[in-house]
């Protein structure tokens, strides 16, 4: 039996994701696909647009066989910890043979070459990185420049194509995946992406990005009026037509129900909750939270009374050496109570949280129970609370945002 793994967000699931799952089956001859998916908050440091159970349903209807939750500590982290956490989950299943990931251009050798440098940084690279950061560059920009400088001096052939290669968010994740895979027996398998880029807002393509799909959703919602439909005369068929070229039909039905039911969540929906957290924590500061330096903590406190909302505050705080995404992650960590030591705690106390599976994956589920090296959680009530307390808290906050009547203790595993 051959099992492929995928680490993803599906925020939301779209045609490009379905294409990837189809290509995994076709190119690897995998019998099953195990998906490790972010829960209710995602790597950009924002709430997911629809909840994790509906996104799980989308994945299972479109080619996935088993969906596991990526703990919120890793799901909201930088690419390094996002990838490392995801690989750790796949490794702990004991059943996954390969990790398949999307790339803008398939160059597996270059990916592994760069991953090796990041895994064991040469002194030349480290010196360049430190110099560039001290010069005011953000960490992502400094890392890219330092890598280009290092490869230009050591591998001329690699340096020529490195600039374009590391400019893509998907390729950066691919590098981090390969870096994490160096510590386990799972092999990497790159899949060529099709369609629009990660940040593209073009919603006319068959393979539009998740960013573009979220943009279309936002045109149907009056965000300032608590997620009410902008035109109450809209019906299911009209909205379905809006998404017919963007996402698989089964997923479109799920998304339409979420829209009409008022279960869509946008980044600024966390604004009031976050402001409360900032006000109650300003005297102590925020340096204990993941990714937050003392300098950024001081900047947050200094500007707290200029706060108007989540995205406005992110834009207010960003600078040449602090990206919007870095700040949004920090603010989300403050909201969720994710502190610096939580990464180690989570790595040292791993678990497998099953969000959903197919009835037809009985062989896979049997093997998982036999080979998993960590606890398998299907019922939150049966799990040690301290093990998944961060995920429960994140889900409780999200449930308030999306007007859900269920919680982690009452919502069952999704079975298709």
From Swiss-Prot:
GO cellular component terms, A-Z: cytoplasm
A biological process from GO: tRNA modification
A matching Pfam family: HIGH_NTase1
Catalytic activity: cytidine(34) in elongator tRNA(Met) + acetate + ATP = N(4)-acetylcytidine(34) in elongator tRNA(Met) + AMP + diphosphate
Gene3D superfamilies per UniProt: HUPs
Chain coiled-coil ranges: none
Alphabetically ordered keywords of this record: ATP-binding, Cytoplasm, Ligase, Nucleotide-binding, RNA-binding, tRNA processing, tRNA-binding
Record EC number: 6.3.4.-
InterPro entries hit by this protein: Cyt_trans-like, Rossmann-like_a/b/a_fold, tRNA(Met)_cyd_acetate_ligase
Binding residues for ATP: 7-20, 102, 170, 193
Location in or out of the cell: Cytoplasm
Any GO MF annotation of the entry: ATP binding
Family membership noted in the UniProt record: Belongs to the TmcAL family.
PANTHER family: TRNA(MET) CYTIDINE ACETATE LIGASE
Its job: Catalyzes the formation of N(4)-acetylcytidine (ac(4)C) at the wobble position of elongator tRNA(Met), using acetate and ATP as substrates. First activates an acetate ion to form acetyladenylate (Ac-AMP) and then transfers the acetyl group to tRNA to form ac(4)C34.
Protein name per the record: tRNA(Met) cytidine acetate ligase
Protein's organism: Agathobacter rectalis (strain ATCC 33656 / DSM 3377 / JCM 17463 / KCTC 5835 / VPI 0990)
